[in-house]
Every structure is written in C-alpha cells, then in structure tokens.
Amino acid sequence: MTVANQEDDTPKRHKLKFRSLPGPYSIVRLAAEAPVPDWATKGNFASITRTADELSIVCPAGNLPDAVHSPHRWICLKLEGPFPFTQTGVLLSFIEPLSNGGVPIFAISTYDTDYVLIQEEYARDAVSALQQVGHELLARRES
C-alpha cells in the first residue's frame, strides 16, 4: 500500500456543533432485574438502558433519591444533529480530541444524534480540547 492510499483510509474528521445541556447529570447502575424507577424518567434528558447484566440510568443529578449513589457529577454535551445513519466518523471526530487529552467520556446515541457526558472536573479541559480542533460550542438552550 502506498502512502497516498494510507491517507485515503484515514477516517474523515467532521467539524461539529455542540451545546451543553443544563445539568449536572448522574450515571447509576442498578441490578438487571430492577424495575425502572420513576425518578429516572423525569427531566429533559434521561437515558435508560437495560441489558442482561445491568440497568444503566443517566438522569439529572437532582432526581436521585438519597439512597442511590453516583460517584461523579457529569456535564452533558449534545451534538447538533440529526446525522444520517450513512454518515461515518461523527462520534469519532468528537471524542478523539477528548481521548487525546485524557478526558474520560460516557457516550449515548439516539436516533437523531449523540450525547457525550463528561465528569465535571474535566469539563473545562474537554470544551477547550473540542474547540481547539474546530468544534463549535453553541449557546445553551434552557428548554
């Protein structure tokens, strides 16, 4: 393979627009057989995923009852979609600079777009890393 062909194999990097959702958020893991609690479904953004191994819940931190512990508080960044299913490299383009900067993430995909949660202590570094590669932070929408 020539150098020119190797460059052709490089995934396309997208310049994306994103916004920070009002937060903070919590991520919790419950037993796989646990019922979905009412508190998990409240708010403008929540994600509930059940597998054979667990029930994962992402929801506003203020929704958690005292008996439920989440070790971190997270910010939630929403990529401005929608993105067609045929478009490749969208999430990679967004999380690669975060990975390069040592920022841990928790990603959620929906039908229209992607959401990336970042621990609050990494928020400033994360936004800076994203902007340095050309991603654009849009004004926050409160609703």
Predicted regions and their residues:
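A cross-kingdom feature marking solvent-exposed beta-strand/loop segments within repeated
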Residues: G101-V116, Y122, S143
